[in-house]
């Protein structure tokens, strides 16, 4: 995977502060992070309907779901599409509302079994995810976040670097294969 030594966020006028996302440059690093977590949430956004440089984001979500590690939450416009492809959605919810729930230390998750300790995000408009991750970074103690989009997100706990579509697909595929 090509990696920039100092990846740049796409929102160049915004300053993420001194604490920035750790770069996931190798699939093994993401596998280790996922294995350490107890309750994982995969959050999918409206841009999952788009193809990124020829890569079908829904296919990547299906690959990630096949590991059986994640509970899936989806933006309202994508939930039915995911269910049509065989991916059960625990909740159809706005990412802003979900961000508010994730920062609530008393929330017990969609299934009532306790708080999620890791939330992975894929398929969101860049600036939308930037804002949600900024809020979670500052106001959600005990929650780790991962940006699985092919663009560096400095407000996440971990993020992929800026990568091309084929590298993105290969990375997610290697993660999935390692977790089976």
Task: Enumerate the predicted regions with their spans.
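C-terminal functional extensions of proteins
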Residues: 2-28, 96-118, 123-133, 138-180
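Short loop/turn segments at strand-loop or loop-helix junctions that form parts
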Residues: 43-46, 149-151
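Redox- and metal-dependent alpha/beta enzyme cores, enriched for Fe-S-associated oxidoreductases
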Residues: 27-37, 44-97
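Conserved beta-strand elements of the Class I
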Residues: 41-42, 120
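Nucleotide donor/acceptor-binding cores
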Residues: 37-40, 143
